[in-house]
C-alpha cells in the first residue's frame, strides 16, 4: 500500500483495468469567493449536447468518448448520489450537472464526479475536519450507491 498521486486522466484507465462496475470520483471544490458552498454531482455530457457550464453547443460537442456508451447509467448514478447527499446532508444542493471531465471521458463503466463541498467556505472546512461529518458523508454516498444498485436490479 502506498499513497501515490494518480492523474485524473489515468484514474479511468485504472478503473478500466480493474474492470470496475462503477466509478465514483470524489472531490472538494475551492473558490475565490468564501461564500460559495454546497455539493454537486457531474455526469459525462452526452455527445452533441452542451455542458452545464457552456450551454451553447459547439463543434467540440460532436465528439464521442468511450464513457458516452454509459450515458443512461451515468445519469442514473449521478441522480442517486445527489439525492442521497440531499437526504443525508440537507444542502445546499448545487444540483446535477453535465461536463466532459477527463476523469469521466474514457470510463468503460458508469461514472460520476461528485464535489462534496467547498473547502474555501469556512463552515464547510470546519465540518470536513470532523470525523462525524465525514462518516455522514460516507453514509450518504453509500446510500446513493445502494439505491443505484437496487434500481439497476429492478430494470434488468
Give the role of each language-model region.
Residues 1-156:
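Active-site-proximal helix/loop segments of hydrolytic enzymes
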